[in-house]
Design a protein with these regions (language model features):
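Active-site helix of classical SDR
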Residues: 121, 157, 165
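Residue(s) in the substrate-gating loop at a strand-loop-helix junction
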Residues: 141
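C-terminal substrate-recognition "lid" of short-chain dehydrogenase/reductases
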Residues: 211-236, 241
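Short, small/polar-rich loop/turn modules that mediate ligand/substrate recognition or access, typified
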Residues: 173, 178, 229-231
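Substrate-binding pocket helix/loop in short-chain dehydrogenase/reductase
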Residues: 97-98, 105-110, 200
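Alpha-helical segment proximal to the catalytic Tyr-Lys
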Residues: 126, 170-174
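Conserved glycine-rich cofactor-binding loop
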Residues: 13-15
């Protein structure tokens, strides 16, 4: 039990984040999930993780608030003593044409999807440097690779995460810390349920939407299974970006 790896998954109560937490728990990690507001979903996820043998807990804090993040990381270290895996998954959408996009909708998405990666990764990377080991996986998107009309804020944030991933991978490699990103395509989650699925599926070579588990298995591979991959962005999109 003392050798179990400790993983922190932001936005881990539902959707892709929950699937990542479950996959890491199945692999033997003690998993801490962060959530923003849905306490019921978070508690349910923790129950599932504990049933898999994970010493899991849910922590409510705003990942875009540096002070709250640092307090949460300190609490994790006081209890778990280490952090081996970080999955920067927390994200929101505030879609709309750029001409009509409010400054608040722009800032909300940038703060939650991009700035949070700094606020969480900064203290966690210092812990990993002391451990001389660690794996960080950032949740990017195909929108950050080729852009998406109506998502200027989201595409900007995800493109920023890709640059962040590559730069940080170069900085931390000498400390045995790997940094990679996963770029999901259209995945069946609450964030995509209102999209015109038939039109989307027609553009996907595999002719279906992905499942959260498709992303989670890739995250688990990058976090735990490989030791010689860093600075990469792995597309999980059914062939949409070829």
């Amino acid at each position: 039990m003392e050798n179990k790896k400790v993983a922190l998954v932001t936005g881990g109560s539902r959707g892709i984040g929950k699937a990542c937490a479950v996959e890491l728990a199945k692999a033997g990690c003690d998993v801490i999930i962060n959530y923003a507001g849905n306490e019921e979903a978070a508690n349910k996820t923790v129950e599932e993780l504990k049933a898999l043998g994970s010493n899991s807990k849910a922590m409510k804090f705003d990942v875009s608030n540096q002070e709250l993040v640092e307090a949460a990381i300190k609490e994790i270290m006081d209890e778990y003593k280490r952090i081996d895996v970080l999955v920067n998954n927390a994200g929101i959408t505030r879609d709309g044409l750029f001409m009509r996009m409010s400054a608040q909708n722009w800032l909300d998405v940038i703060n939650t999807n991009l700035n949070s990666a700094y606020f969480v990764t900064n203290p966690v990377s210092k812990i990993m440097i002391k451990q001389r080991s660690g794996a960080i996986v950032n949740m990017a998107s195909i929108s950050g690779i080729y852009g998406n009309a109506g998502q200027a804020n989201y595409s900007t944030a995800k493109a920023g995460l890709i640059g962040f991933t590559k730069a940080l991978a170069k900085e931390l490699a000498s400390r045995n810390i790997r940094v990679n990103a996963v770029a999901p395509g259209f995945i069946q989650t609450d964030m995509t349920k209102n999209l015109p699925q038939e039109q989307i599926v027609d553009k996907i070579p595999l002719k279906r939407l992905g499942e959260p588990e498709d992303i989670a298995k890739t995250v688990k591979f990058l976090a735990l299974d490989t030791t010689y991959i860093t600075g990469q962005v792995i597309g999980v999109d059914g062939g949409l970006v070829i």
